């Protein structure tokens, strides 16, 4: 595993680490430290099941259930955000095409969450 800053930014990219495999404590500590240092980590080209996604999320820290979430996967810790529709025209996830401004989820908690883990399945080529 390698962790490198993305050129000209505060973002760090974690390379050569298949997240679908168990992560050793040494790599887990390095990932947590990198997150504390920069606040944004990128893991490219991962193909994860929901169980694998949750297992990796637990490497970073215990997940917080988001009470207002209306688009849950089969796991209560995983919420689906999407602007896609199924063949019947029903939304596949929350938010749709609603405009959003920058915000932090659950920052109003007495002890705010540490961060948010986003897993992109279909992404635009830019933007």
Regions found by a protein language model. Give the residues of each.
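Fe(II)/2-oxoglutarate oxygenase catalytic core
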Residues: 2-127
């Amino acid at each position: 595993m390698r962790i490198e800053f993305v050129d000209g930014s505060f973002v760090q990219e974690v390379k050569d680490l298949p997240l679908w495999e168990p992560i050793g404590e040494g790599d887990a500590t390095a990932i947590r430290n990198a997150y504390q240092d920069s606040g944004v980590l990128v893991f490219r080209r991962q193909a994860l099941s929901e169980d694998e996604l949750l297992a990796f999320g637990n490497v970073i820290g215990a997940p917080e259930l988001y009470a207002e979430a209306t688009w849950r996967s089969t796991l209560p810790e995983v919420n689906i955000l999407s602007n896609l529709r199924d063949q019947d025209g029903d939304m596949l996830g929350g938010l749709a095409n609603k405009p959003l401004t920058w915000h932090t989820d659950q920052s109003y908690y007495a002890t705010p969450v540490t961060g948010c883990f986003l897993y992109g399945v279909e992404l635009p080529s830019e933007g």
